[in-house]
Design a protein with these regions (language model features):
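Short, acidic/turn-prone active-site loops that include or flank metal/cofactor-
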Residues: 81-83, 140-141, 156, 174, ...
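Transmembrane helix-bundle segments that form internal channels/tunnels in multi-pass membrane proteins
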Residues: 1-57, 70, 250, 270-281, ...
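Active-site-proximal loop/helix segments of hydrolase catalytic cores
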Residues: 59, 63, 91-100, 113, ...
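Soluble catalytic regions of membrane-associated enzymes that act on cell-envelope
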Residues: 50-169
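Short, intrinsically disordered C-terminal tails of secreted or membrane-associated proteins
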Residues: 339-345
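Flexible, acidic/histidine-containing loops and adjacent segments that form or flank the divalent-metal
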Residues: 14, 120-121, 125-212, 273-283, ...
Length: 346
């Protein structure tokens, strides 16, 4: 079965126009040209990063995490969202369809930041559809979702390059015991124009240790344009020293809409606002309406229900390339020129 990326919004109307044209009475001029109107539907535009650039796509898996990292010729999935026994599997229901819609044909690597279900639960379903040859997880990882998988360790210092983009693990260091959240893989992505930091569920203790190690080694620098706020924006993450060390222009919090934990915490978001004197980009993950590259109102805000008073406070930002996708994803382009672009999508 061959999956095509989701086409642009105008592809289906053009295809219908072509079908109508072919059904016109015999002798209608130019009927053979009607087939050309099907091309946008059958061969959609695959927008891929150029060499030296990377694209981050945050997939809305509810209260969990799943991030696609894509370079010109390679793809990596960082976590695969939650799954529960005999219940919802975000890997099957959200991640795999989103990868198909994005035109991903293979995964070159998959990372389970740690063994908790909200991060690794959907990995088995993803690997059935996209059997990634490289699979990373913390040393001695525990978790039902990872049993039986052949895994490499995401030990600090392990790095490689894809298409001019450097990917490097910053945590956990060698001989670090498995402590669930505190053992989360931390991945740094460096492009020609910008950088990103994916932090898993680490807490303030590990964040302070990363600041200390960054001061000793330039290779472990925390400076980044885009930072994934650790642990969904919980109160146990985002140490002020860590926030300052990143100097992030954009901060992303992956959390379920209306979750019972109150993620992301308002005080945590304020820590990220303060250094840059600007709002972090992801008040909450969730659907957003289509629009231009400027700030806009999300779909939840535009279609707020009377039982959800907080919906009007959900905002999003976007770039036109992501606005065409019919899946709940947030797109960040790292290093697409000097600016980091973003999209909170439906």
């Amino acid at each position: 079965l061959w999956w095509l990326p989701e086409p642009r919004w105008f592809a289906l109307p053009l295809a219908l126009l072509g079908a109508f044209w072919l059904l016109l009475p015999r002798g209608t001029p130019g009927k053979a040209l009607a087939v050309l109107l099907w091309l946008p539907l059958l061969w959609p535009d695959r927008r891929l990063p150029a060499p030296g650039e990377a694209e981050l796509v945050v997939i809305d898996v509810g209260q969990g995490l799943s991030v696609l990292v894509r370079t010109a010729n390679h793809s990596l999935l960082f976590d695969a969202g939650p799954a529960v026994r005999d219940g919802f599997d975000a890997g099957e229901r959200a991640v795999v369809p989103a990868l198909h819609a994005l035109g991903v044909r293979r995964l070159d690597a998959a990372v389970a930041s740690h063994g908790d279900q909200d991060h690794a639960g959907g990995l088995a379903a993803v690997l059935r559809a996209f059997p990634a040859p490289l699979r990373f997880a913390p040393p001695d990882v525990e978790g039902a979702a990872l049993r039986g998988l052949r895994l490499r360790t995401c030990e600090a210092g392990r790095e490689w390059r894809w298409d001019g983009v450097r990917l490097r693990f910053l945590h956990p260091p060698a001989h670090f015991p498995y402590l669930r959240n505190e053992s989360s893989c931390v991945l740094r992505i460096d492009t020609e124009h910008g950088s990103a930091l994916l932090t898993g569920d680490i807490g303030e203790v590990v964040e302070r240790d990363l600041v200390r190690r960054a001061a000793l080694s330039p290779a472990d620098s925390l400076r980044a344009d885009v930072v994934l706020i650790a642990h969904h924006g919980s109160a146990e993450s985002s140490d002020p020293a860590f926030v300052r060390a990143t100097g992030a222009r954009y901060a992303l919090a992956s959390s379920g809409h209306g979750n019972r934990f109150g993620h992301p915490r308002a005080d945590v978001l304020e820590r990220w606002r303060r250094p840059a004197r600007r709002s972090p980009t992801p008040p909450r993950m969730g659907p957003c309406g289509s629009g231009s590259a400027r700030r806009r109102t999300g779909a939840r805000a535009g279609r707020a229900r009377f039982w959800n008073r907080d919906a009007k406070h959900t905002r999003g930002c976007g770039t036109r390339p992501g606005a065409r996708l019919g899946y709940p994803i947030a797109r960040i382009e790292v290093g697409h020129g000097p600016e980091v672009r973003e999209c909170w999508n439906w």
